[in-house]
Amino acid sequence: TRCKGKGAPCRKTMYDCCSGSCGRRGKCG
């Protein structure tokens, strides 16, 4: 679960990095 792009560092209820690894239906786009 690591992300290095934009937004927060993918935690447990805040996924934002859609260009790293964590990209759930949170805030990607």
Curated annotation (Swiss-Prot):
Biotech / industrial applications: Could be used as a diagnostic tool for the autoimmune disease Lambert-Eaton myasthenic syndrome.
PTM annotation: Not hydroxylated; hydroxylation, on a synthetic hydroxylated MVIIC, has a significant impact on the oxidative folding but not on the biological activity.
GO molecular function annotations of the record: calcium channel regulator activity; ion channel inhibitor activity; toxin activity
Modified residues (Cysteine amide): C28
Subcellular location(s) of the protein: Secreted
Intrachain disulfide bonds: C3-C18, C10-C22, C17-C28
Keyword Membrane belongs to the record: no
Signal sequence coordinates: none
Tissue specificity note: Expressed by the venom duct.
Pro-piece positions: 1-2
Sites annotated Important for Cav2.1/CACNA1A calcium channel binding: Y15
Family according to the record: Belongs to the conotoxin O1 superfamily.
Comment field on protein domains: The presence of a 'disulfide through disulfide knot' structurally defines this protein as a knottin.
Name of the featured protein: Omega-conotoxin MVIIC
Native source organism of the sequence: Conus magus
